[in-house]
Swiss-Prot record:
PANTHER family: EAP30 SUBUNIT OF ELL COMPLEX, VACUOLAR-SORTING PROTEIN SNF8
Subunit structure: Component of the endosomal sorting complex required for transport II (ESCRT-II).
One GO cellular component term: ESCRT II complex
SUPFAM superfamilies: Winged helix' DNA-binding domain
Protein location: Cytoplasm; Nucleus; Endosome membrane
Protein name: Vacuolar-sorting protein dot2
Similarity comment text for this entry: Belongs to the SNF8 family.
InterPro entries: ESCRT-2_cplx_Snf8, Snf8/Vps36, WH-like_DNA-bd_sf, WH_DNA-bd_sf
Originating gene: dot2
UniProt keyword list: Cytoplasm, Endosome, Membrane, Nucleus, Protein transport, Transport
A GO biological process held by the record: protein transport to vacuole involved in ubiquitin-dependent protein catabolic process via the multivesicular body sorting pathway
Record-linked Pfam families: EAP30
Membrane topology according to the record: Peripheral membrane protein
Source taxon at top rank: Eukaryota
Length: 252
């Protein structure tokens, strides 16, 4: 196909330029409209938060839905520190701060027993038992996770880690190597491991199994059960029952 030259080509270039300008104007206009609508929606959500503050704080399902909606429209509680934020309107900054303080206390109280690695589900269950007097379970695991996330500006003291698909709170500086992570994932699935289990499933040498198990025991992440035919290594966090956690917490 021959390329057009002369006046006709110039006209085509002018048309293309005009189309581009019109397109940019439309995009800018639509962007402004969307931004305006989003701002209106955010203000409406803040008003809703103020009107339903009590229910948001006390009803975990209602709060979880509200949080998801707020995050979708850009009201992130861990980014926005403004007094005009939806979280400030409903008092959720203070709420998550209070939850974080309680999470810290539970983690510190159980460090000697679990090596500073405690599952989010255990922390959530324990805190909810403390609130039975209110007649409802007002904390969800997502609340505990958000509370731990809110501690990030304070430094790396509390970190969320995922082991075998389950979330844990690490409250002690701890670097785990690949073998140690593999063993902890197996413990999360089975409840315990033995040298035979590790050798059969991962084809490890006996010396390798002993080394990694001893390392985890020294970190208080595994407890030894020598009553069976073969020595078993149980996950420390799985062995701490609720009564033990309550005792530790009350006497911390």
């Amino acid at each position: 196909m021959r390329k057009r030259i002369g006046i006709g080509a110039l006209n085509d270039d002018e048309y293309l330029k005009q189309y581009e300008e019109v397109g940019n104007e439309l995009i800018e206009q639509q962007s402004d409209e969307i931004a305006s609508q989003l701002s209106t929606f955010q203000e409406a959500l803040k008003t809703f938060a103020r009107e339903h503050a009590t229910e948001i704080k006390q009803n975990s399902q209602f709060r979880n839905t509200f949080v998801k909606l707020a995050l979708k429209i850009g009201l992130d509680p861990f980014v926005s520190g403004s007094d005009e934020s939806a979280w400030a309107a409903v008092g959720m900054n203070e709420f998550y701060y209070q939850v974080a303080v309680r999470v810290i206390e539970v983690c510190y109280a159980t460090q000697m027993e679990n090596g500073g690695l405690l599952s989010v589900s255990q922390v959530c269950r324990f805190l909810n038992e403390e609130n039975e007097a209110f007649g409802h379970e007002w904390l969800r695991e997502t609340d505990v996770v958000r509370a731990v996330d809110s501690l990030a500006p304070l430094g790396p003291g509390f970190v969320l880690e995922k082991i075998a698909g389950k979330q844990y709170i690490r409250s002690l500086p701890l670097e785990l190597n690949t073998d140690q992570n593999v063993v902890l994932e197996a413990v999360e699935i089975l409840g315990y491991v033995t040298i035979s289990i590790l050798r059969d499933n991962y084809a490890w040498e006996r010396s390798r199994c002993i080394q990694v198990l001893n390392d985890l025991v020294s970190k208080s992440l595994l407890w030894i059960d020598s009553q069976g035919v073969e020595m078993a290594y149980w996950g420390a966090s799985n062995l701490i029952d609720d009564q033990a956690q309550r005792f530790l917490y009350e006497n911390f």
